[in-house]
């Protein structure tokens, strides 16, 4: 499924995918392991899934959608008050905005706009840290320090969160 010099844009609802070329023009992708140990089974990851499901259930009372990814940022903002629990609202916001960031990231890659791609990565980390709350202090230090390095276009946590890469 993977293809050299390409990212994969995967729709997790349909499993449809498309390739987005990655043209780095001398730039490098660096993956850093924070060495923080975690277990997705026993971590708060399952709580995040449940909170996101609650956000979806609540917003479905005012929107005819199947997934949070069916909403645009603007639609979410217009209907977010239907999500009564503040934590669930943050989780829902992350899901909607992250989906929109991903769509924009694919467009940026296809247009060879690596700067925009990097900014979207940065925004993704901020959302994972502040709205989905799956980052940790060790990863935040790595990301914050990367942002200070001249030439770094983007930095974010990857994987299930709560440590790791």
Predicted region positions:
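Glycine/serine-rich anion-binding loops at beta->alpha junctions
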Residues: 151-165
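C-terminal nucleotide
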Residues: 2-154
């Amino acid at each position: 499924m993977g293809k050299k010099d390409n990212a994969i844009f995967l729709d997790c609802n349909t499993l449809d995918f498309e390739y987005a070329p990655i043209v780095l023009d001398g730039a490098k992708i660096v993956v850093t392991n924070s060495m923080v140990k975690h277990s997705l089974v026993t971590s708060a990851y399952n709580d995040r899934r449940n909170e996101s499901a609650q956000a979806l259930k609540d917003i479905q009372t005012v929107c005819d959608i199947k997934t949070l990814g069916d909403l645009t940022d603007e639609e979410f903002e217009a209907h977010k008050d239907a999500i009564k629990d503040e934590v669930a609202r943050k989780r829902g916001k992350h899901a909607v905005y992250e989906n929109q960031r991903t769509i924009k990231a694919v467009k940026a890659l296809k247009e060879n706009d690596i700067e925009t791609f990097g900014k979207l990565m940065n925004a993704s980390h901020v959302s994972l840290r502040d709205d989905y709350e799956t980052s940790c202090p060790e990863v935040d230090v790595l990301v914050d320090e990367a942002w200070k390095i001249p030439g770094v276009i983007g930095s974010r946590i990857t994987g299930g969160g709560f440590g790791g890469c």
